[in-house]
UniProtKB/Swiss-Prot annotation:
Similarity comment: family membership: Belongs to the universal ribosomal protein uS14 family.
One GO BP: translation
GO CC term, one of those recorded: small ribosomal subunit
Entry coiled-coil feature ranges: none
Keywords from the named record: Ribonucleoprotein, Ribosomal protein, RNA-binding, rRNA-binding
Protein name stated in the entry: Small ribosomal subunit protein uS14
Single GO MF descriptor: rRNA binding
PANTHER family according to UniProt: 30S RIBOSOMAL PROTEIN S14 (PTHR19836), SMALL RIBOSOMAL SUBUNIT PROTEIN US14M (PTHR19836:SF19)
Subunit structure comment from the entry: Part of the 30S ribosomal subunit. Contacts proteins S3 and S10.
SS bonds (residue pairs): none
Record's function text: Binds 16S rRNA, required for the assembly of 30S particles and may also be responsible for determining the conformation of the 16S rRNA at the A site.
Domain of life: Bacteria
Amino acid sequence: MAKKSMKNRELKRQLTVAKYAKKRAELKAIIVDLNASPEARWEATVALQKQPRDASAARMRNRCRITGRPHGVYRKFGLGRNKLREAAMRGDVPGLVKASW
């Protein structure tokens, strides 16, 4: 189990990313736009750098919804490998069966 502080930190990051997503997208569009003046592109770059670090989606970490485990998380299910296996063995995941060949 992950510490509560780590789970809360991730939640805070998700909220920060959501808060700044629109503004970041606008600034990135200006930076990539070749028709924009160099000054405008530079100002957009500086404004993007002044935003909080946690506003970047790249800093978010996928965690297991049950345990908070950061590694071995399946995106499709949102569960860590251990909890996914337990759920599959109980039959809680429709369509998921244990491999056999």
